[in-house]
Amino acid sequence: MSAPSTSTVVRVPFTELQSLLQAIFQRHGCSEAVARVLAHNCASAQRDGAHSHGVFRMPGYVSTLASGWVDGQATPQVSDVAAGYVRVDAAGGFAQPALAAARELLVAKARSAGIAVLAIHNSHHFAALWPDVEPFAEEGLVALSVVNSMTCVVPHGARKPLFGTNPIAFAAPCAEHDPIVFDMATSAMAHGDVQIAARAGQQLPEGMGVDADGQPTTDPKAILEGGALLPFGGHKGSALSMMVELLAAALTGGHFSWEFDWSGHPGAKTPWTGQLIIVINPGKAEGERFAQRSRELVEHMQAVGLTRMPGERRYREREVAEEEGVAVTEQELQGLKELLG
């Protein structure tokens, strides 16, 4: 999770930030429905301290829309495929509106069958992944999602990049506690965090990436300008990244991370790939005991010395934001106003 820049920080009410972001999306070609979904996602990331996926992303969204690479007016096409399977053609638009269009059907299937799969293809995902799964856990369901991105990661033992950062997000209910939620790239670092470090003139820890010659580097600009990221944990992260390619692209009908070509759309930033979401109803197995067992696990992890659960920092940031407003820098706020025009 990245920190905001060193510019003066101001606090903005969440609803005010969300409204501003929605207006920007609509100003640059998104329908009201699409703009509303994207604005909530982006504002939520900023609120929770995930700055690499918050308002930092807005110039990329705008340049992508201007390039014609993504359709901000797309209407997702939902197909009820089987008792536990839903398929969505995002119609060249963003993945989050596709999820929103299929969500009610997906939840109904998961509650009935015990498990349901949502396969999204022909979609663009440029955001944090945890907002896609956390709401399911708030309803007592377990959710897992994977999405592949653009080629920027060298598989372990390989010489050239092939995979995307290929994140995995998971959410589960926990009795008398916030849901257990994590969202992690299978690369050593999120691509957005590399961009933020480059903008700030900061060096990266060792083991994050390589330069254009395949040599290890701590220079984020070298990684972005012809270099590549490494998978986390060597062969283990590489295997998980491969799994994401199979689930998010091969299974859904989406593009692999290397299969699309945006060279004809200068300014395009959003990967045109796929997403898979699996939702499980624990009530079909352990019933209400599952949330209690989740709580038991948390308590035992804390008892052995764990001081921060996955996702806990986000909840703390959220609590502060609810009282004081969402943290944005004056520079970021001015940039948003300029995007609005």
Swiss-Prot record:
The keyword Oxidoreductase applies. The gene is dpkA. Is inhibited by the substrate analog pyrrole-2-carboxylate, but not by N-formylphenylalanine. This is Delta(1)-pyrroline-2-carboxylate/Delta(1)-piperideine-2-carboxylate reductase. It comes from Pseudomonas putida. The enzyme reaction proceeds through an ordered Bi-Bi mechanism. The active site is at S52, H53, D193. It is an enzyme of class 1 (oxidoreductase). Homodimer. The keyword NADP applies. Keywords: NADP, Oxidoreductase.
